[in-house]
C-alpha cells in the first residue's frame, strides 16, 4: 500500500474513533460515581453522569473535593460518559 493510502486509512480510522459514541464498556469508571458536592460552600452549577438514568444532570458543586464525575458543561459530560 502506498504512503498516501496508509495516510488515508489512518485518517479514516481516526475519524471513526472520534465519531463513535462511548459505550458502557468504554466509559471511564468515574462516570459510575454518584454526584458529590464536596464539603465547601460554593455554588457552582456543574454536571455529572447519572448511570441509572443514562444521562448527564446538573447539580450544585461546592468547589472543592468531590469526585471526578464533575463536568463544567453538559457537552463535556456527554462526550466523556454518555453512550
UniProtKB/Swiss-Prot annotation:
Family matches, as Gene3D superfamilies: Pancreatic trypsin inhibitor Kunitz domain
Domain (BPTI/Kunitz inhibitor): residue spans on this chain: 31-81
Disulfide bond annotation, renumbered to this chain: 31-81, 40-64, 56-77
CDD domains in the record: Kunitz_textilinin-like
Listed transmembrane segments: none
Tissue expression summary: Expressed by the venom gland.
PROSITE patterns: BPTI_KUNITZ_1 (PS00280), BPTI_KUNITZ_2 (PS50279)
Residues spanning the signal sequence: 1-24
Gene Ontology CC terms, in alphabetical order: extracellular space
Compartments, as annotated in UniProt: Secreted
SUPFAM superfamilies: BPTI-like
Alphabetical list of Pfam families matching this protein: Kunitz_BPTI (PF00014)
InterPro entries listed in its UniProt record: Kunitz_BPTI (IPR002223), Kunitz_BPTI_sf (IPR036880), Prtase_inh_Kunz-CS (IPR020901), TFPI/VKTCI-like (IPR050098)
Entry's Gene Ontology molecular function annotations: serine-type endopeptidase inhibitor activity
Alphabetical UniProt keywords: Disulfide bond, Protease inhibitor, Secreted, Serine protease inhibitor, Signal
Family: Belongs to the venom Kunitz-type family.
Function: Serine protease inhibitor.
Listed name of the protein: Kunitz-type serine protease inhibitor nigrescinin-4
